[in-house]
């Protein structure tokens, strides 16, 4: 995750007045580039402790079941590529994890949502890959929050729009089967989000062909380009 760059203050004389050069150069918050929060799913080590699926909920889910075989590594690799593309386009980027382990806060999906919330993300991109006992299953799908008063009602319209735009771009970039959009009410990372949030299942790790593609850097760049283009459609640069 790129850190804020320090600015060396200089002084400029103008009509007998000293002005801070840095103050002249710094963009106002209104013109700052949108921040995209990339959330590579899972960790190398599962975390089976429980957390509420939404604020005040009596329903609990495990924080991290580990995902499909190899998923955590693949989505991190794609996340790095996506970060490069977005930074090159002029976006600001934050990543929930840049190593094998997510260590922010109390970990889990509440912490992932809070990480993006506190940075005021224009979009939270949750990167995942699918798994199935049926090894013939393949394709890309994008999940978005279901409506729930007090949880997702404020982010649902924008999240659904982002899901549609990103799904179309990833399918076009990869040629993968289009499995469409999926509305989910039970995902902790959605229910605690205060910013538009979507989850992209970038393919099936359990399909021999698709799983092999997802592990290959060339295909990962295709996925990342689709994600970047869809993000650009949803959050144009000022």
Predicted segments, located by residue:
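Active-site-adjacent mobile loop/cap segments within catalytic or ligand-binding domains
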Residues: 47, 126-134, 143, 178-238
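Bacterial N-terminal signal peptides
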Residues: 15-27
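Active-site histidine-acidic residue metal-binding/catalytic motifs
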Residues: 33-113, 146
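Soluble non-cytosolic domains of exported or imported proteins
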Residues: 69-77, 103-110, 153-161, 214-225
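Active-site-adjacent substrate-binding region
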Residues: 155-186
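Mature extracellular/periplasmic domains of secretome proteins
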Residues: 108-122, 187-192
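Sec/Tat signal peptide C-region and signal peptidase I cleavage site
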Residues: 28-32
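Sec-exported extracytoplasmic/periplasmic mature domains
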Residues: 80-92, 98, 117-121, 129, ...
């Amino acid at each position: 995750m790129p850190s804020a760059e320090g600015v060396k203050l200089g002084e400029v004389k103008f009509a007998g007045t000293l002005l801070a050069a840095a103050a002249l150069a710094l963009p106002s918050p209104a013109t700052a580039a949108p921040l995209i929060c990339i959330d590579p799913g899972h960790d190398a080590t599962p975390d089976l402790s429980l957390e509420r699926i939404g604020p005040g909920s009596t329903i609990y889910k495990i924080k991290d079941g580990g995902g499909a075989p190899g998923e955590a590594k693949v989505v991190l690799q794609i996340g790095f590529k996506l970060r490069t593309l977005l930074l090159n386009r002029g976006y600001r980027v934050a990543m929930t994890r840049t190593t094998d382990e997510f260590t922010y806060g109390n970990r889990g999906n509440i912490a992932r949502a809070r990480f993006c919330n506190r940075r005021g993300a224009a979009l939270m991109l949750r990167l995942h890959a699918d798994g199935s006992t049926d090894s013939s299953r393949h394709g890309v799908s994008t999940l978005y929050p279901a409506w729930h008063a007090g949880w997702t009602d404020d982010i649902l319209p924008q999240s659904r729009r982002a899901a549609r735009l990103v799904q179309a771009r990833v399918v076009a970039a990869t040629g993968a089967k289009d499995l469409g959009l999926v509305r989910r009410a039970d995902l902790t990372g959605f229910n605690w989000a205060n910013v538009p949030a979507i989850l992209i299942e970038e393919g099936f790790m359990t399909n021999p062909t698709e799983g092999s593609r997802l592990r290959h850097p060339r295909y990962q760049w295709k996925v990342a380009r689709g994600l970047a283009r869809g993000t650009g459609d949803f959050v144009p640069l000022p």
